[in-house]
Amino acid sequence: MGKGCKVVVCGLLSVGKTAILEQLLYGNHTIGMEDCETMEDVYMASVETDRGVKEQLHLYDTRGLQEGVELPKHYFSFADGFVLVYSVNNLESFQRVELLKKEIDKFKDKKEVAIVVLGNKIDLSEQRQVDAEVAQQWAKSEKVRLWEVTVTDRKTLIEPFTLLASKLSQPQSKSSFPLPGRKNKGNSNSEN
């Protein structure tokens, strides 16, 4: 099991961040339940990666963002990964996800950071404001994976979190510094 990765789940108010986590982890979200504003919760999850390794995730369920309110900066400094959530029936929520991605890039200084994007509430397709193709094109241009999901179908939630855990548990790339006792490649030592 890995060291435990910190994942920040963020998006506008009422896009379903808490519902996604509750359904994914406990399978107990009730559709039509009245929204309660989240201050901040931390969920612990053990997620199996695509390599069969279990990765411990600390999922930070953030307070829903509102107009003019930014994600507190401390999240950018400690997060190993992000889940950006928008609602397919709320264009403003998608636009906020676009801004959040830019903020992550700025604060992480373009360092490799695991990000997945979830377009929630696909069961409300008759109220759709975010075109699926436009969202996928944006995700492709930003080099992030995007899934459209619904808390009414728990299976739609599993793959994004499996991929995220897999990205977070990838072995560190090899050091570019020579290790003691090893010869450098391309450095022939003819004096021996």
Curated annotation (Swiss-Prot):
InterPro entries: KBRS (IPR042227), P-loop_NTPase (IPR027417), Small_GTP-bd (IPR005225), Small_GTPase (IPR001806)
PROSITE patterns: RAB
GO cellular component entries: cytosol; endoplasmic reticulum
Residues that coordinate or bind GTP: 11-18, 61-65, 120-123
Stretches for region Disordered: 168-192
One of the protein's GO biological processes: negative regulation of canonical NF-kappaB signal transduction
Oligomeric form and interacting partners: Interacts with both NF-kappa-B inhibitor alpha (NFKBIA) and beta (NFKBIB) in vitro. However, it probably only interacts with NFKBIB in vivo. Forms a complex with NFKBIB and NF-kappa-B heterodimer (p50/NFKB1 and p65/RELA). Also interacts with c-Rel (REL).
Domain comment (free text): In contrast to other members of the Ras family, the members of the KappaB-Ras subfamily do not contain the conserved Gly and Gln residues in positions 13 and 65, which are replaced by Leu residues, and are therefore similar to the constitutively active forms of oncogenic forms of Ras. This suggests that members of this family are clearly different from other small GTPases proteins.
Entry function: Atypical Ras-like protein that acts as a potent regulator of NF-kappa-B activity by preventing the degradation of NF-kappa-B inhibitor beta (NFKBIB) by most signals, explaining why NFKBIB is more resistant to degradation. May act by blocking phosphorylation of NFKBIB and mediating cytoplasmic retention of p65/RELA NF-kappa-B subunit. It is unclear whether it acts as a GTPase. Both GTP- and GDP-bound forms block phosphorylation of NFKBIB.
Protein name: NF-kappa-B inhibitor-interacting Ras-like protein 1
Source taxonomy: Eukaryota, Metazoa, Chordata, Craniata, Vertebrata
